[in-house]
């Protein structure tokens, strides 16, 4: 990457359109077989998952970068390395409310996606959802 890794024009427009009550970001929901991610109590192996994600971040260095605004906003923001990067801020567990059906998962996804990502850190999150019916 170049010395100045500038945000694209499209991403910058999303950034400026965003409001606290209306975040403008992309999200996805994927359902996987839970057993490999769970310990004997049925809880997510977060430390192991965080270690696996962290070990692969060198392939996607932007996931360790946060935005920095240009003085007076005279140009698009740039991506800068986050010296305070903590994988625990990005990979978390959350339990879907009972009964753990598709509707509850949809509501949880809506709630998580409606929250703004903190701009002081890299702009991504990974939520491991437990409590789905059939887990």
Q: Can you describe what each PLM-predicted range is?
A:
Residues 1-135:
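Non-catalytic N-terminal regions of enzymes
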